[in-house]
Amino acid sequence: VKEAVSIPVIGNGDVRSVEDFHRMMNETGCDAVMLGRGIVGNPFLIQECVDSITGQKHEFSMEDRIEICMDHAKGLADTKGEKVAIREMRGLASWYLKGLPSSRIFKNEMSQMNTLEDLENILRQFMEVQRGNQNHLGF
C-alpha cells in the first residue's frame, strides 16, 4: 500500500505492546502507528512506544500514575458527567496502578466506587499503603 500512494500511511489494529508497535512498523513500512484499544489496557503505551524509538526510558512514579488517573476521571466527568465517568473508571482506574505492590487489593474497591471523591480517597489510601503506612484497611 505504501508504495502505491503518495500520502502518509498510518498502521492500525491490534497494537497492545511495544513489540506490536514495532511489528506494525517493520512489517508494513507505515509512516506512523495509531494506538486505540491498546492504551485502554496500558495507558502508558504511547510513552513506551516513543521511548522505544528515542532510546529514553520514562518511568511513571506512583504519584504520576495517580495524578494521570485523576485527570482522566475528571476529564470524563467534565464531558460525560460524574455518574458516567465513575462507571467507566471502575474498569479503567486499576490499570493505572497495575504492577505496583498492593494494587490488587484496591481493584475491588475501585469496582465499587460511586463518586470522584471515592476515587480520590481510594487513591490516597493506596499511596499511604505504598509509602508504608499499613495501619488502615486492616493491614
Over which residues does each language-model region extend?
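Alpha/beta catalytic cores of nucleotide-metabolism and tRNA/nucleoside-modifying enzymes
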Residues: 2-11, 15-139
